[in-house]
Amino acid sequence: MIPKSINEVSTAWLSDILGAEVTSTQPIQIGQGVGLMGDIFRVELKYARATTGLPDSVVVKLPSSFEENRAQGVDLGMFEAEVRFYNEMVQDASVGVPEVYLAEIKSGTADFVVVMEDLSHLEMVDQSTGMNVMQAKSAVEILASIHAVWWDRVQVPEMDWIPTM
């Protein structure tokens, strides 16, 4: 099941994904008004029993509540590319990525969900105001290392879903 909104993200659904009984959740929307293509929530979790190695919170990414953002995400292949990256390419990533507990999409639509590690201890850049010079320099260096991993590798049929310029 792919939830259409945070209201469909239940304790039972999260329990299945995390492999432990989740008894309560507290979703908090994050990233509003900063140019994001989806609705993103930090979901604080409580478990039935003490857990080791399970998160106290996760981030849940869902389709935007704005039709124009959903349409643009589909038209540009953004949602599908993100889900497929986590499911098919993340093991080759040259940089750290969040742990992903679930990434699903109904191909060709805006129906998708990503449940991932909460990295709220890190800084997120506001897309509408931009980066400072040091952040931009760091981003370019990281993008170059990511790009290098797949240099001359994406022109194969199994990677034809990757948008090209």
Predicted ranges, named:
Residues 28-165:
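Conserved ATP-binding subdomain of kinase catalytic cores across diverse folds
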Residues 1-29:
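Juxta-kinase regulatory segment immediately upstream of eukaryotic protein kinase catalytic domains
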